[in-house]
C-alpha cells in the first residue's frame, strides 16, 4: 500500500514541497532564512489578526485604541510588541535572504528572483502602511512625507497625492484605506510566497558552490526540517528577548505622542529597515531625482541577473567579487546609519558618497571585477 502522503491530492503537494523534496546536501545555514521568512509571515498574520480585533481605524480613536490594547486587553501588550518587533525580524531575515541570493548567484533562477523582488516591494508597502496605523507623530508625518513624494511625478503628481490621501491632507480617509491595505497585503504576500516556492521547486535549490547538485541530493525531511527548526528556535528566542526586554529599542519615541498636524517633529525618519533607502532619497537635492534614486535603489535588484558577467555562478571562488560584496554590505550599513542622522554637514556628504558608491558597486565595479576574474581564470 502506497503511503497516503504520496497519493492524496493535497498531501502530495505538501509532500513534494516539504518532505520528499530533493535538496543539495551541502547547503549552509544561510539557506534557513526562506523558512524563517515563512515563519515570520505566519506570526505577523496571527498577531495582526488579534490586533485588528481591538484596533479602530479612525483618527480620533486610533491612538487610544493602541493604548487600550496595551493596557486593557489580556496580553494585548505582548501581541502588539510581537507584531512591531516581528516586522524588524522579518526585515533582518529578508535582507539576509537577499544577501545570500546575491552572494551565491541565486539570481540565475530568473523567475524565482523576480517574484522575490516583487515580494520585497509588497513587504515594504505593507510595513509602510502598517507604521501609519498607531497614529502617533512619526506615523502621521512619515505618511505625509512619503506620500508627498508622489507629487514629484510631472503633470499628474498633485492629483495623484490627493487621490491617495482621499482629501487634501493625511486624514481619516487615509488612515482607513491604509488599514484596509495593511490587512489585505499580507495575504497577497502569502500567495506570492507560494508562487516563489513553485518557481524554486521547478529548478531545485542552489548551493554554496553554484555547481548543479543533482547527483548528490538528499530528502528535505528529516535533514533540513530539523535544521530549520534550530533556525526557528533562534529566531523566536531573539524575538522574545527583544519584545520582553527592549520592546521600544527599534521604535521611535515620537510615536508615543498622538499625531498633531500643527507640530512637526524635529527629525522625521522611517523605521530602521527603510533608512538606507531614505538616506539615498535625501542625498539628492532634487525632489524628482531623489524619488527616482529611491525607486532605483530597490528596482536595481531586478537587473542583477543581467549584470552577472562572471562565468561562475557563486562568489565562493571569486575573491575580488567577495571583497566588493562585503564593501556593499558595509555601504548599506553606512547608509542605514546616515538615514537616521539629521541633514547636517558631515552626514550629508557621507550619505552622498555612500549613495554613489552603492550604485557604482552594483552597476560598474562588480560586473568589471567578474570580467577580470574570468580573464585570470583564462575563461
UniProtKB/Swiss-Prot annotation:
PANTHER family for this protein: CYTOCHROME B
Note: Heme 1 (or BL or b562) is low-potential and absorbs at about 562 nm, and heme 2 (or BH or b566) is high-potential and absorbs at about 566 nm.
Single Gene Ontology MF annotation: ubiquinol-cytochrome-c reductase activity
Compartment list: Mitochondrion inner membrane
Quaternary structure, from the entry: The cytochrome bc1 complex contains 11 subunits: 3 respiratory subunits (MT-CYB, CYC1 and UQCRFS1), 2 core proteins (UQCRC1 and UQCRC2) and 6 low-molecular weight proteins (UQCRH/QCR6, UQCRB/QCR7, UQCRQ/QCR8, UQCR10/QCR9, UQCR11/QCR10 and a cleavage product of UQCRFS1). This cytochrome bc1 complex then forms a dimer.
Residues that bind heme b b562: 83, 182
Location (main, coarse): mitochondrion
Annotated PROSITE patterns: CYTB_CTER, CYTB_NTER
GO CC list: mitochondrial inner membrane; respiratory chain complex III
Listed transmembrane segments: 33-53, 77-98, 113-133, 178-198, 226-246, 288-308, 320-340, 347-367
Cofactor binding remark: Binds 2 heme b groups non-covalently.
Cofactor(s) needed for function: heme b
Gene3D superfamilies, alphabetized: Cytochrome Bc1 Complex, Chain C
Assigned keywords, A-Z: Electron transport, Heme, Iron, Membrane, Metal-binding, Mitochondrion, Mitochondrion inner membrane, Respiratory chain, Transmembrane, Transmembrane helix, Transport, Ubiquinone
Protein name per its UniProtKB record: Cytochrome b
Residues that coordinate or bind heme b b566: 97, 196
Originating organism: Eschrichtius robustus (California gray whale)
Annotated family: Belongs to the cytochrome b family.
Pfam families assigned to the protein according to its UniProt record, in alphabetical order: Cytochrom_B_C (PF00032), Cytochrome_B (PF00033)
GO biological process: mitochondrial electron transport, ubiquinol to cytochrome c
Binding site for a ubiquinone: 201
Record carries keyword rRNA processing: no
Amino acid at each position: 500500500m502506497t503511503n497516503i502522503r504520496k497519493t492524496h491530492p493535497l498531501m502530495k503537494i505538501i509532500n513534494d514541497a516539504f518532505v520528499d523534496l530533493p535538496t543539495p546536501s551541502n547547503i549552509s545555514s544561510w539557506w534557513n532564512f526562506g523558512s524563517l521568512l515563512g515563519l515570520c509571515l505566519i506570526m505577523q498574520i496571527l498577531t495582526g489578526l488579534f490586533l485588528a480585533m481591538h484596533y479602530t481605524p479612525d483618527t480620533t480613536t486610533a491612538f487610544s485604541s493602541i493604548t487600550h490594547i496595551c493596557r486593557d486587553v489580556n496580553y494585548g501588550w505582548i501581541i502588539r510588541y510581537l507584531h512591531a518587533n516581528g516586522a524588524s525580524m522579518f526585515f533582518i531575515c529578508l535582507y539576509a535572504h537577499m544577501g545570500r541570493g546575491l552572494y551565491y548567484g541565486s539570481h540565475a533562477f530568473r523567475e524565482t528572483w523576480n517574484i522575490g523582488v516583487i515580494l520585497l516591494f509588497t513587504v515594504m508597502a505593507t510595513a509602510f502602511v502598517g507604521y501609519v496605523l498607531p497614529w502617533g507623530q512619526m506615523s502621521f508625518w512619515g505618511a505625509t512625507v512619503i506620500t508627498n513624494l508622489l507629487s514629484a511625478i510631472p503633470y499628474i503628481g498633485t492629483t495623484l497625492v490627493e487621490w491617495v490621501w482621499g482629501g487634501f491632507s493625511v486624514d481619516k480617509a487615509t488612515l482607513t484605506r491604509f488599514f484596509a491595505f495593511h490587512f489585505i497585503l499580507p495575504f497577497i504576500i502569502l500567495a506570492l510566497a507560494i508562487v516563489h516556492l513553485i518557481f524554486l521547486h521547478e529548478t531545485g535549490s542552489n548551493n554554496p558552490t553554484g555547481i548543479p547538485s543533482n547527483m548528490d541530493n538528499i530528502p528535505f525531511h528529516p535533514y533540513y526540517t530539523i535544521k530549520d527548526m534550530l533556525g526557528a528556535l533562534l529566531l523566536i528566542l531573539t524575538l522574545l528577548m527583544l519584545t520582553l526586554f527592549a520592546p521600544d529599542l527599534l521604535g521611535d519615541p515620537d510615536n508615543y505622542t498622538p499625531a498633531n498636524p500643527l507640530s512637526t517633529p524635529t527629525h522625521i525618519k522611517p523605521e530602521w529597515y527603510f533608512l538606507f533607502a531614505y538616506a539615498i532619497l535625501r542625498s539628492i537635492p532634487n525632489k524628482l531625482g531623489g524619488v527616482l534614486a529611491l525607486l532605483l535603489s530597490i528596482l536595481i535588484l531586478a537587473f542583477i541577473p543581467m549584470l552577472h558577467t562572471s562565468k561562475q555562478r557563486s562568489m565562493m571562488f571569486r575573491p575580488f567579487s567577495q571583497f566588493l560584496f562585503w564593501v556593499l554590505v558595509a555601504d548599506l550599513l553606512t547608509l542605514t546609519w546616515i538615514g537616521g542622522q539629521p541633514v547636517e554637514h558631515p552626514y550629508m556628504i557621507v550619505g552622498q558618497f555612500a549613495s554613489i558608491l552603492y550604485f557604482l558597486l552594483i552597476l560598474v565595479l562588480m560586473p568589471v571585477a567578474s570580467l577580470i576574474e574570468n580573464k585570470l581564470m583564462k575563461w
